C-alpha cells in the first residue's frame, strides 16, 4: 500500500470532518481492522523470509536449483534434530527409517558449540496464528469500546447536562473509594483487636508471677530478725533494700489489680503478729515492743509501693497514712502496763487497720479509671478526619472557581469566619459550639474534656482517701480512750516511754523512705501534677494526727508549721529535684523493661 501525499491526507481529513459521527466511527473501525490485518501479513512474510535465509545458509552450493524446496525442509529437519544430509530425499516420507542405509549415529556424543548455535532457532522469528488475538489489537478494541460508550453517554446532550452527569459520576467514584477505604480500615481494626486479645493474658500472668516475690522475702526476713533493742539499727536498712526492690518491680508492672492482690499478702494479720511475738511473759515488756513494731512498721512502708501507678493524690495520701500508722502504734503501746493488755490492744489495732486497708483497696478498685473521650472516626470518609475535610474543601474551592470564571460577578453572601473563644485561632478542621454559645476549636474542646474527666477521677480518689483517714482517726481515738481507762504504774510507764523515744527516733529516720521509694515509681508525666496537688487544701492535716511531733510537713502545705518556709517556686523546684531517681535505679528500671 503506497503512502499518501500530504495534499491527499489533508483532503481526506477534511472529508472525515464533514462526515457524520456514525460514519466517521465506522470508517475508523474499518481502518483499524485493515491495519491490523496488514500488520499480521507483514509479520508472516518476515518470518517466511527469515526461514528462507536460514535455509540458504544450510543448503550446499552444488544444488542451487533446489533452494526453495529443500531449504525450508532442511530447516525443519534441523529443528527436529536430524543429522543426515539434506540432499538425500529417499527416506524423507517414511518416519522411523532415517538410519537404515547410513552408518549408526552416536547419540551420546556431545554436539559442538557451532552446531548447537546453528540448531537453535533465531529469536527474531515470531510465529503467529490467525486465531490468536495479539495484545495491541485487544487493547485497541478495549479503547474502542470505552470510547464508543463515552460517546453514546454524551450523545444528544447539552453542556449543562454533561457537567451534571460528570458531577454525578464523580460522586459515585468518591463513594466507591470511601467504601473501599472503610472496608480496609475495618479489616485493620479487626486484626488489631485479635492481637490485643492474644497479648493481654501473657501480661497478666507475668504480673502475677513477678509481684508477690518481694512480699514473701520481706516476711521471711522479718520473722528471722532477732528481737532485741540493739537490732533496731539493722532492721530499717533491710526494710529499705526490700522496699527498693518492691518499688522497682512494681514500676515495671502496669496492671493495678495485681499490685493490690500482692499487697494483701504483705499486710500481717493478728495471727502472724501473735506467732512472731510468742507467749506473753511478765519479764518481756521491753522485748515484745521492738519485735512488734518492725512488723507493723513494715506494713505501711510496703503499702507505699501500691499507688505508684495511680494519680499523685493517692500517692500523697498513702504517704500520710504511712506516717500516721507508726505513730499510732507507739502512742498506744506507751501507757500499757501489762503484757496481756498490750497484746489485746495490738491485736485489735492490727485487725482494725487490716480491715480498714482491705476496705480502702476495695473502694479504690471500684473507682473506674478516667475514660478517654469518645474518639472521632479516623478513616477517610469520616467528616471528623482533618485530611478528608481538607481535600473536600479544596475540591469545592476549585469547583467554585471553575464555575465562577464564565459568570458575571454577582453579589455573594459574606459570612464572618469563626474564631475560637479560648485560643483565638481562626482555623480548625472541626468547629464545636457549646451550650452557652461559645465556639471552640477541636483541640480546645478535646483538652477541656480530658481535663474534666481527670479532675473527676482525682476528686473521687481524694474523697476515698480522706474517708479512710477519718476512719483511721476514729479507731485511734477509740484506742486512746480505752488506754486512758486502764490503770497505769510508774515503772512500766517509764520503761515504755524510753522505748517510745527510741521508736520515734527510728521512725523519723525511716519517714523519708516511703516518700523516696514512692517517687521512684511515679512516672515523669505525673511529677508536674504532684507539685500542684501538694498545695491542695485537703492535705492540711494537723500535726497531732501524725503522731510525730518532730516532723514538720511544711513542704506539703504552707499553712502547716510555725515558721515561714521558702518561696513557692523554690519549694517546687526542691520537690522536683528530690523526685529524680538515682542513676543506678533508673538504669535497672530501663534494663527490666
Swiss-Prot record:
What biological-process terms (Gene Ontology) are attached? chromatin remodeling; negative regulation of DNA-templated transcription; negative regulation of transcription by RNA polymerase II; positive regulation of DNA-templated transcription; regulation of cell fate specification; regulation of stem cell differentiation
In residue numbers, the region (Disordered) covers 62-123, 213-235
The record's InterPro entries line, in alphabetical order, gives: P66, P66_CC, Znf_GATA, Znf_NHR/GATA
Keyword tags: Chromosome, Coiled coil, Intellectual disability, Isopeptide bond, Metal-binding, Nucleus, Phosphoprotein, Repressor, Transcription, Transcription regulation, Ubl conjugation, Zinc, Zinc-finger
Q: Where are the zinc fingers (GATA-type)?
A: 414-467
Provide a GO CC annotation, any one. Answer: nuclear speck
Report residue spans for region: CR1: 165-195
Q: What is this protein called?
A: Transcriptional repressor p66-beta
Mind giving the lineage of the organism this protein is from? Answer: Eukaryota, Metazoa, Chordata, Craniata, Vertebrata
Amino acid at each position: 500500500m503506497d503512502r499518501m501525499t500530504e495534499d491527499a491526507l489533508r483532503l481526506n481529513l477534511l472529508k472525515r470532518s464533514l462526515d457524520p459521527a456514525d460514519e466517521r466511527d465506522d470508517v475508523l473501525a474499518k481502518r483499524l481492522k485493515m491495519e491490523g490485518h496488514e500488520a499480521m501479513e507483514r509479520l508472516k512474510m518476515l518470518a517466511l523470509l527469515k526461514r528462507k535465509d536460514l535455509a540458504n545458509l544450510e543448503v550446499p552450493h552444488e544444488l542451487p536449483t533446489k533452494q526453495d524446496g529443500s531449504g525450508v525442509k532442511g530447516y525443519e529437519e534441523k529443528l527436529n534434530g536430524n543429522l543426515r544430509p539434506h540432499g538425500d530425499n529417499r527416506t524423507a516420507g517414511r518416519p522411523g527409517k532415517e538410519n537404515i542405509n547410513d552408518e549408526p549415529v552416536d547419540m551420546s556424543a556431545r554436539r559442538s558449540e557451532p552446531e548447537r548455535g546453528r540448531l537453535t532457532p533465531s529469536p527474531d522469528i515470531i510465529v503467529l496464528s490467525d486465531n490468536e488475538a495479539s495484545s495491541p489489537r485487544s487493547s485497541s478494541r478495549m479503547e474502542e469500546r470505552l470510547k464508543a460508550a463515552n460517546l453514546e453517554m454524551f450523545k444528544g446532550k447539552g453542556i449543562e447536562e454533561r457537567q451534571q452527569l460528570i458531577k454525578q459520576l464523580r460522586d459515585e467514584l468518591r463513594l466507591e473509594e470511601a467504601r473501599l477505604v472503610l472496608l480496609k480500615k475495618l479489616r485493620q481494626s479487626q486484626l488489631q483487636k485479635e492481637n490485643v486479645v492474644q497479648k493481654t493474658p501473657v501480661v497478666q500472668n507475668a504480673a502475677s508471677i513477678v509481684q508477690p516475690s518481694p512480699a514473701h522475702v520481706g516476711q521471711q526476713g522479718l520473722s528471722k530478725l532477732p528481737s532485741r533493742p540493739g537490732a533496731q539499727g539493722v532492721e530499717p536498712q533491710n526494710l529499705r533494700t526490700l522496699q527498693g526492690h518492691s518499688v522497682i518491680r512494681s514500676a515495671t508492672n502496669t496492671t493495678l489489680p495485681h499490685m493490690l492482690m500482692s499487697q494483701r499478702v504483705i499486710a500481717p494479720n493478728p495471727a502472724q503478729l501473735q506467732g512472731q511475738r510468742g507467749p506473753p511473759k511478765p519479764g518481756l515488756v521491753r522485748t515484745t515492743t521492738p519485735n512488734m513494731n518492725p512488723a507493723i512498721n513494715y506494713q505501711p512502708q510496703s503499702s507505699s509501693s501500691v499507688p505508684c501507678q495511680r494519680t499523685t493524690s493517692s500517692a500523697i495520701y498513702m504517704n500520710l497514712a504511712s506516717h500516721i500508722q507508726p505513730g499510732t502504734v507507739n502512742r498506744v503501746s506507751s501507757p500499757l502496763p501489762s503484757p496481756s493488755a498490750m497484746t489485746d490492744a495490738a491485736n485489735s489495732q492490727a485487725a482494725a487497720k487490716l480491715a480498714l486497708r482491705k476496705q480502702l483497696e476495695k473502694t479504690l478498685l471500684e473507682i473506674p479509671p478516667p475514660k478517654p473521650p469518645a474518639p472521632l472516626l479516623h478513616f477517610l470518609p469520616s467528616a471528623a478526619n482533618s485530611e478528608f475535610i481538607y481535600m473536600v474543601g479544596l475540591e469545592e474551592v476549585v469547583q467554585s472557581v471553575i464555575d465562577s470564571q464564565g459568570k458575571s460577578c454577582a453579589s455573594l453572601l459574606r459570612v464572618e469566619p469563626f474564631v475560637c473563644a479560648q485560643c483565638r485561632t481562626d482555623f480548625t478542621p472541626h468547629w464545636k459550639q457549646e451550650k452557652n454559645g461559645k465556639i471552640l476549636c477541636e483541640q480546645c474542646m478535646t483538652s477541656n474534656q480530658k481535663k474534666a474527666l481527670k479532675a473527676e477521677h482525682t476528686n473521687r480518689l481524694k474523697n476515698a482517701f480522706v474517708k479512710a483517714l477519718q476512719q483511721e482517726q476514729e479507731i485511734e481515738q477509740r484506742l486512746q480512750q480505752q488506754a486512758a481507762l486502764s490503770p497505769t504504774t510508774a515503772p512500766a510507764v517509764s520503761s515504755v516511754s524510753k522505748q517510745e523515744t527510741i521508736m520515734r527516733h527510728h521512725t523519723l529516720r525511716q519517714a523519708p523512705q516511703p516518700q523516696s521509694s514512692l517517687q521512684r515509681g511515679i512516672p515523669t508525666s505525673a511529677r508536674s501534677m504532684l507539685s500542684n496537688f501538694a498545695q491542695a487544701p485537703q492535705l492540711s492535716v494537723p500535726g497531732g494526727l501524725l503522731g510525730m511531733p518532730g516532723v514538720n510537713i511544711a513542704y506539703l502545705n504552707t499553712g502547716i508549721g510555725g515558721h515561714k518556709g521558702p518561696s513557692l517556686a523554690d519549694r517546687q523546684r526542691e520537690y522536683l529535684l528530690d523526685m529524680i531517681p538515682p542513676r543506678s535505679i533508673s538504669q535497672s528500671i530501663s534494663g527490666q523493661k
